Amino acid sequence: MKKITKNLFAATLISVAASALAVTDVDVDNSFKPYTAGFPTVEGITAGLVITKDNVDQYASVLDDGMIKHIKDGWVEITVGEPMDFVLNQGYIDATKAGAKNVKLGAELGEIEGYVAGRAFPEEPSLDDPRAGEKMAWNFQYGYNWGDGAAISPFYWAYKNMNTGKVERNIKFNFYFLNFAHRVNHDPKPEVQPNPSKLFRAIYLNVEEPFDIKNTQLLIQRSQNDLKRDNAWLYLGFQRRVRRLATGQVTDSFLGSDLMIEDFEGYNGRISDMNWTYKGTKTMLLPMYDSSKQNRTSEYNESDGYTYSTYHGKGGCFPNVTYSLRKVYVVESDPVDPNHPIGKRVHFMDAQTFTLPRTVTYDRQDKYWKSWMIGQAHPDSHLPINKGSGVSIDDAFGMMDVQSMHCTTGQFKGIIDPDLIKLKQFSVQYMRSFGK
């Protein structure tokens, strides 16, 4: 039995290695430009269509089961917008062409070899490949989400009762992202130096309002070695001290919201923390759009005139944005740790950008638990500084806990500007000095 298993595993590795060597520029072009021959079409679905509980059955093939249920229950209606081509940054595409042929999976989950920068596995996934889901996960992990570095400043969260729509709490954050390695567009490339801890990426955030949690901060450092655990520290403003987060705390509610730290960006964890299964490719409606054509609000009175996304539907929990037909990879992730609080996530990955505009979470009894939506604005329709950046801009999120009937929403002001990112922000020492 051991010999058979070993032979099968060896065959898988040979297949993976061969597929990596077979990557061509045509594969890369097809991956980044899947709509060269035109956008996908589905009978009856055109810009301006409103999908309601009265007609949702007609369009069920382009929606996930959770969204179909929400529409049937009268929680939300979806308006279809014009399709847009979200071509990513040319530096990221060039890095893919230069390096993808050298990339292969390692022997263990979470191991990758030969990767430098760009999209790790641009070839089309196959249901016959038992590790296709893992490859898709790496494409997300090494995606161009926020580029080499960016800020969300400010970032407004609201905690809402889904039954009444009452806003229970508002928090004003500032988020900062920095890729220490695998950089493709902004110097230093391909890696920040010095980088003695061999970090891949870091996230730093602080709370600006309300006063009772002002100066609360979170720092997450992710290693280039996916088998090493993330380092995470929390500074609570009222305690005025930094404490390291234990592994299990990244799956606790973050500051009383409906999100775990692991939920950030659709999934904020290691590849090795999950088993990944590719379930197929579909044409689906995703919240990807021209932000200049959405219903926006000036409620925060930004000095530059920037307007934010609005919300509608049950409890005001759904981003009020248009959806467009997209090529989607369906990937399931289930925790390696049997004590993890979730049973599985179903990710609907946008095939062009490898962002996660839609993720559905099930509990350990396989019951529908959480609904994640994150609206993606085309950069050329967003802030002037984002135009031409080739970054699909996170613009509006809604995380609904459908079991407790509660949600958290987030309105972004995402800025692709390396001058806003300071290396010193991504250290414990900075957290202490900022909190004083």
Write out the residue ranges for each language-model feature:
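A short, surface-exposed beta-strand/turn
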Residues: 221-226, 344-358
